[in-house]
Amino acid sequence: MKLAVFAVLISTVAAFVAPNGVQRAATTELNAERREFLSAAAVAAGLAFPLTANAIRDYENVGYLGGSEIVDVNNANVRVYLKMPGLYPTLAGKIASNGPYNAVGDLYNIPGLSGKEKELLKKYESRFTAQKPQADYVIDRFNNGLYR
């Protein structure tokens, strides 16, 4: 009798357990599906977050944009010329609108300069430098968005 009960219990349990061969195939299929899903998710994540641009965060000539006595005539905002009496707004606007300049001496070739303006340029010539124009700063030469 005990043997009969034991046989019934084993057959009942066996009905709910898959054979080893079927279980491995199902597991292999699930692993393959997981791998496909994860690879698709990785591709989607790569497309959702494209490579970032290599922007220059620390511009080596940032001091010439108004933080020192020397002013970069190609990249500085017109308000920087407030430090030099007589240049702002008229001559500063001419300097900003006629660049870029290869050298400080090119400032004297600005069309329409008066004799007085050339004298002012000569007075402050030692405080000017002509660095390579940087698009991030050239665009802000007239309006850098800073208001008092």
Swiss-Prot record:
> Nucleotide-binding: present as a keyword of the record?
no
Topology within the bilayer: Peripheral membrane protein
InterPro entries the record matches: PSII_PsbU (IPR010527)
Reading the lineage from the top rank, the first entry is Eukaryota
Query: Which region of this protein is its transit peptide?
Result: 1-32, 33-54
- Single GO BP term: photosystem II stabilization
Subcellular location(s) per record: Plastid, Chloroplast thylakoid membrane
The alphabetized UniProt keywords are: Chloroplast, Electron transport, Membrane, Photosynthesis, Photosystem II, Plastid, Thylakoid, Transit peptide, Transport
Q: How does it assemble?
A: PSII is composed of 1 copy each of membrane proteins PsbA, PsbB, PsbC, PsbD, PsbE, PsbF, PsbH, PsbI, PsbJ, PsbK, PsbL, PsbM, PsbT, PsbX, PsbY, PsbZ, Psb30/Ycf12, at least 3 peripheral proteins of the oxygen-evolving complex and a large number of cofactors. It forms dimeric complexes. The oxygen-evolving complex may be composed of PsbO, PsbQ', PsbV and PsbU.
Report what the protein is called: Photosystem II extrinsic protein U, chloroplastic
Q: What is the lineage of its organism?
A: Eukaryota, Sar, Stramenopiles, Ochrophyta, Bacillariophyta
